[in-house]
């Protein structure tokens, strides 16, 4: 879906299509490729040498292997745009691979992270871009109408930021599922939105930093509140999953604070203490 979306958007901007690599294209995509005067290919090959820009939009688990398969066929000066949700370290390794294995050719690997739902935003979905040719890629995508932000000079920087964002957004999504389902069960869904209004009115950065800054000294009391919220879910025939993990984090913080009291007052001090005493990996 992502590849077809951006293919169509680039065609509408007047770019030429060299070809599409797709094992099982649907009829609409195949027709669009044919209408653009190109062909659908089952694998990377010599046809890639005609491209100035190659866009990869596959699953993150195969991002590196696909790049390795494309690399021998890429022309000097090509920009390879990886739009997969791949591991940041793999993106860095691909960037290094492009520098080492290009055999005298300049191959520019650029990491592009999609930070929204393409099925909703289409080619206007916000993007994060990182790599030596990030500025070029930004200029390439900006005419499509979305936000395109350069976030780093090394491949992997965009992917890393997207995954950091996912800690918050996917965690919030999981809690939203449990919260709204419980509210619906209790007949309080509309009233819930009203009592959450103060959160709507608080800038996200202010909210996050306040939560972290006050988390440690209030962890024991807040853990009890989370336990009561879990019991309320259970009384309504629901089995908490995300909220159980939330309670465990508050309990771990409370235990650590009892052993090694936190005496700081700033967000930075709280982050350092939590990283050392609560979230650090244990052998």
Which residues does each PLM region occupy?
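Hydrophobic beta-strand scaffold residues
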Residues: 17, 40, 108-110, 148, ...
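NAD(P)-dependent dehydrogenase/reductase Rossmann-like domain
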Residues: 251-283
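NAD(P)+-binding Rossmann beta1-loop-alpha1 motif at the extreme N-terminus of oxidoreductases
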Residues: 1-49
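Short, well-ordered alpha-helix to beta-strand connector turns
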Residues: 14, 37, 50-51, 77, ...
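Rossmann-fold dinucleotide-binding core
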Residues: 63, 86-170
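Glycine- and other small-residue-rich loops at beta-strand/loop junctions that grip anionic moieties
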Residues: 22, 56-59, 83-84, 152-153, ...
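Rossmann-fold NAD(P) dinucleotide-binding segment
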Residues: 44-112
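Helical "substrate-binding/catalytic lid" subdomain
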Residues: 161-264
């Amino acid at each position: 879906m992502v590849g077809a979306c951006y293919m169509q958007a680039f065609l509408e901007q007047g770019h030429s299509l060299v070809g599409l690599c797709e094992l099982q294209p649907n009829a609409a995509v195949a027709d669009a490729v044919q209408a653009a005067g190109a062909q659908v290919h089952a694998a990377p090959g010599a046809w890639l040498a005609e491209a100035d820009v190659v866009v990869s939009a596959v699953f993150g688990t195969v991002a590196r292997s696909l790049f390795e398969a494309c690399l021998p066929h890429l022309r000097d000066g090509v920009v390879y745009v990886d739009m997969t949700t791949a591991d940041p370290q793999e993106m860095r390794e691909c960037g290094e691979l492009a520098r080492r294995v290009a055999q005298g050719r300049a191959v520019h690997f650029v990491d592009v992270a999609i930070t929204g739902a393409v099925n909703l935003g289409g080619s206007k979905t916000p993007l994060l871009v990182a790599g030596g040719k990030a500025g070029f890629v930004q200029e390439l995508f900006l005419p499509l109408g979305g936000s395109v932000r350069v976030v780093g000079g090394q491949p992997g920087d965009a992917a890393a930021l997207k995954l950091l964002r996912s800690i918050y957004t996917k965690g919030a999504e999981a809690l939203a599922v449990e919260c709204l389902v419980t509210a619906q069960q209790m007949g309080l869904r509309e009233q819930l939105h009203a009592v959450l209004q103060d959160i709507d009115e608080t800038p996200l950065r202010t909210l996050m930093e306040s939560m972290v800054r006050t988390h440690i000294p209030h962890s024991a009391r807040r853990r009890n509140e989370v336990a009561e919220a879990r019991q309320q879910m259970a009384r309504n025939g629901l089995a908490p999953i995300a909220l159980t993990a939330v309670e465990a984090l508050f309990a771990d913080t409370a235990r650590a604070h009892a052993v090694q009291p936190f005496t700081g007052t700033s967000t930075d001090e709280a982050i350092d203490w939590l990283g050392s005493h609560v979230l650090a990996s244990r052998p």
